[in-house]
Structure formats: C-alpha cells, structure tokens
UniProtKB/Swiss-Prot annotation:
Belongs to the UPF0754 family. One of its GO terms (cellular component) is plasma membrane. This is UPF0754 membrane protein tlr2287. The lineage of its organism: Bacteria, Bacillati, Cyanobacteriota, Cyanophyceae, Acaryochloridales. It is a multi-pass membrane protein. It comes from Thermosynechococcus vestitus (strain NIES-2133 / IAM M-273 / BP-1). The chain crosses the membrane at residues 2-22, 386-406. PANTHER family: UPF0754 MEMBRANE PROTEIN YHEB.
Length: 414
C-alpha cells in the first residue's frame, strides 16, 4: 500500500464543488450577459451577446404562442369577459358614465343648452302638439278617463267653504246685485207690455181676495207708479232697495245657498248627464279652438326662460340621481342579456382587433435585456440559485468519487 496524503483526498471534492458551483453560475449568467455583442479585431466573440438577448425576438414569439395557446384561449377570454362584465360592474360603469355626461353638460354653457331645449319645446307646443290634438280629439274616447276623473273627483265634490261663500256673496251683492243695478233691472222689466200682461194675468187667474184686488183696484197703476218712482227718485230708491236687502237678510241667504250648492245633491242620472255634457263640451272646444289656443299660448311663452329654469331644476333635483340609478340598472340588464347571447361571437371578433400576440411580442422585444434579466431573476431567483448550489454539490460528489478511486488505487500499489 502506497502512502497517500490527505491533500490528495481532499482536493478533488473541493475542486469539484468549486468548479460545479461556478460553472453553473457562469452558465446562468451567460443566459443574459453580455447584453450586447463584443467584437475583437472586427470579429464577434462567440457567445456574445447572451443567449436570451440574442434570441429575444424568438423568445417573444414563443412566449406569445404559449400564452395564447394554453392560457388565453378563446374560452378563457370568454370566462374573463363574463367575470369582468358582471351586472353590478356594468351597472356601476353605466352609472358613472351617465353622471360624468351630466356633469359635463352642466359644466357647459347653460344658455346654449337652454336655447336647444327652448327650440325643441317651441316646435313641439307650437307645431307638433296642435296637429296631434286635432287628430286625437276626433276619437270618441279622447281624454275620457281623465275628464271623468276630473269631474268625479273635483267638480262633483266641489263645495264652497264658509269663507269662500261669504266672499262670493259679498261680491254678488256689491258687483252683480247692487241697489242701483236692481233699480235699473226693475225699470227694464216694467215695460208697458209687461205691466199689461201682469195685469191681465192677475185679473184672469186669481180668486178670492186676490181677485177682488186685481179686478177692483188692479196692479197696473201700482206698477206704473213703482216704475216712475225708480226713474225719478234714484237715490231714494237705491236706499230703499239697500234697506230691503238688509231687512230680508239677503246676504245670509246667499251664503247658505252657496254653501249648499254642490252636484252631490243632484240625482245620479242628472250627474251622469252633466258628466257626459262636460266631456263633450271639452272635446268640442278642443276640436274647434284647441289648436289655435295652443299656438297662441306658444307664441307668447318665453321658452328660453322656461328652459333655463327646467335645466336648473333638473340639475338640482334629487329625483335625478334615483332616475340615473334606475336607468343604469335597466341598461345593465339589457347589456347582460345581449352579452350572454352573443359572447362567443363578440370574443371571436375582438381577438383579431386586440391582436394580443403582437402586443406580447412587441412588449417583450421592447424590454431591455437588463430589465428582462431582472424580471426573470425576480420570478425564478430561488430556482436559479438552487441550480447553482446543485452544481456545487454534484461537483463535490464527483470529487469524492475521484478521491475514493485514488484511495483505492493507492491500496493496490504494493
């Protein structure tokens, strides 16, 4: 057995471990570096640039093929689109778009928006609505439910309050039936012909004491004297009539009559006839005068002012937010039904438009070798380090085997 030093047995494992470790580390480094080709004497040094920088375009194509072939398949894109376009997300997007559009409109000139709305309203009320009213009013059921409801809920139940009846009675006595107007009415009524007719009727159609008075005394002279008194004694007649109105409590009687004046006291058949007459009267008036009335009113209305008020009221209206919520919900449901039905066709048409493979290739090609190395190192740093360590371990094991062989050979030497 030949003597063998410990260094002979120790060096192979250490050298193998060091060589294996740094060889793998160099190999991994050469995947990325150098980033650019190196030239010596006008000739490119082999293995420059690194493997990945030299084949970056081909790598980009392989990455794109792998992603689109196994990851982003049409089926996966459909599933992704379904998750992305859920009803709640679509509703939120639509609501945001509506709010943004409304804010944009509000930020613009109100005067211009008001002018556009004013032109629309002027055209509708001045031209379109009168023509529509002429056509609609020819129908037998034109506004029938609305007019019936108006008659039943307003006119039938209409009854003056105490204050209203008192004011109306005062107006009637002061404007419609003042003493002077009553005096003139008596004068106009007591014509010669009227007096003669009354005298003859009383003489022929009375009996008892009234017949004696009518035939012996007569009323002709009395009525003539009353007429003369009204004509000649105007102030005194007005005072007498005023005293008579007060004595007869005519104001109180008018108040009571006006308070009791209501359609509810009429028979049901009469009320129905009045309702039908009311409906026919309104329809006839609209047929004959409705169009001209609407046109006349439209010409006198300041549509710009009204439009500006509408826009400002709409802008500050609390119901606008609720309306946007409802509209967003309905549009989201409609869009969801459409997408559920045509999702496959939409994705099929969208893939060529998106051109995902070209996007991936361009992004990989546009990435610098330094950033590409950092990205790969960030993803598989631990795995690459494990490969380096594995190289060191394998080199060490090979060195151990070699040391064992040397030791065995030393045993065979006499």
């Amino acid at each position: 057995m030949a003597d063998i030093s410990y260094w002979t047995l120790l060096v192979p494992p250490l050298a193998g471990g060091v060589i294996g470790y740094f060889t793998n580390d160099l190999a991994i480094t050469m995947l990325f570096r150098p980033y650019k080709p190196i030239y010596i004497g006008g000739k490119q040094v082999p293995f420059t640039p690194g493997l990945i920088p030299r084949n970056q375009e081909r790598l980009a194509r392989r990455i794109a093929d792998a992603i689109l072939g196994s990851l982003l398949t049409p089926e996966e894109l459909q599933n992704l689109a379904r998750r992305l376009l859920q009803v709640q997300r679509v509703k939120a997007v639509i609501h945001w778009l509506l709010q943004t559009s409304l804010s944009q409109i509000q930020a613009q000139s109100e005067q211009r928006s008001a002018q556009v709305l004013a032109n629309i309203l002027r055209d509708f009320f001045g031209s379109a609505l009168p023509r529509l009213m002429k056509v609609w009013s020819r129908r037998e059921d034109f506004l029938e439910p609305q007019l019936n409801q108006l008659f039943d809920q307003v006119l039938v139940e209409l009854q003056l309050s105490d204050e209203q009846a008192e004011k109306l009675a005062d107006w009637l006595l002061s404007v419609m039936l003042p003493p002077d107007r009553l005096r003139l009415a008596i004068i106009d009524f007591l014509t010669d012909r009227t007096i003669n007719v009354l005298d003859q009727e009383l003489r022929q159609n009375t009996s008892g004491t009234y017949w004696v008075v009518a035939n012996l005394v007569g009323v002709r002279n009395t009525l003539i004297r009353l007429r003369e008194y009204c004509l000649n004694e105007r102030e005194a007649c007005n005072r007498r009539l005023g005293d008579l109105i007060t004595a007869l409590a005519l104001r109180q009687r008018l108040v009571e009559a006006l308070q009791n004046l209501t359609l509810q006291s009429l028979p049901l058949g009469t009320v129905r006839e009045l309702r039908q007459l009311f409906r026919q009267t309104v329809r006839s008036y609209i047929q004959e005068q409705g169009a001209s009335v609407i046109e006349t009113v439209s010409q006198t209305v300041e549509w710009e002012t009204i439009s500006l008020s509408i826009l400002r009221r709409l802008r500050d209206s609390a119901s606008l937010g609720a309306s946007l919520e409802v509209v967003s919900d309905e549009l989201a449901l409609v869009l969801d039904r459409y997408l559920e039905r045509d999702m496959e066709l939409i994705v099929e048409r969208a893939i060529p438009i998106l051109d995902l493979d070209r996007v991936i290739v361009d992004r990989v090609k546009a990435t610098s070798p330094e950033n590409l190395e950092l990205a790969i190192q960030g993803i598989v740093r631990s795995e690459l380090q494990a490969i380096v360590r594995l190289g060191g371990i394998l080199g060490f094991l090979i060195g151990v085997v070699q040391a064992g062989v040397l030791y065995w050979q030393s045993l065979q030497v006499p």
